[in-house]
Amino acid sequence: MKIIDPYKRVEFLENALFEDIGYHKFIPYIQLHEFEALLLANPEILLMEYVTAHNQIEKLKEIVVNYDNNPEKVNTGNTTAPSKRIIALIPEYEGNKVSVGSVLAGIEGIEVQKGRCKHFADWINKIQNISEQSV
């Protein structure tokens, strides 16, 4: 069975993980495509590290718009994954994506990512609901 819709595919995998682990407090999360989708929720954050990349940031924003303005959908192949698109426009990102990407994504907090990345937001909301129930 091949699941075409990326959201349904990830949901299927997360449900399988949940059932396999079998622990009610385990909340699986598989990032839709890759971490850099969260950076594409607000590409302008990349300007904090790449201060002269204004034109490249505008191109990244256009890419997201072309995917229904949904950063989680930006991926149609090995060369078009979010990180590959960032690297194509900002080659310096390749050498420091692990350190820069995680720091930049965390600077704004998660509200921007939650607002633009449905799958990510659903997972965070599950965690927050459990946390609120525990209080």
Regions found by a protein language model. Give the residues of each.
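C-terminal accessory helical subdomains adjacent to catalytic cores in phosphodiester-
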Residues: 1-135
